[in-house]
């Protein structure tokens, strides 16, 4: 039987460039554990086009079109609330990293 990999959605704040190192640590950790990582499109654009980071992701999502096991919110209260509003009634656990 094939092992199922956990799926994560990541939301972030594109105004907090100083957190780029922490973001890359989290992405590296998840990649080593063969997790599927999906990144919110605005945050992905920030990481790749503004910060010029090489980000490995299974996909990029907008709005509510993601189906994951966990959500990681990288930022403050506003980012967490944005993630919570997108999760809605799905009941997906959210980990907030400030």
Regions from the language model: what does each represent?
Residues 16-19, 45-46, 50-52, 58-98:
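Small-residue-rich beta-alpha loop regions that form the catalytic core of phosphotransfer
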Residues 28-34, 48:
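Short glycine- and acidic-rich boundary segments immediately preceding or forming the N-terminal edge
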Residues 12, 40, 73-74:
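Active-site-adjacent beta-strand anchor residues
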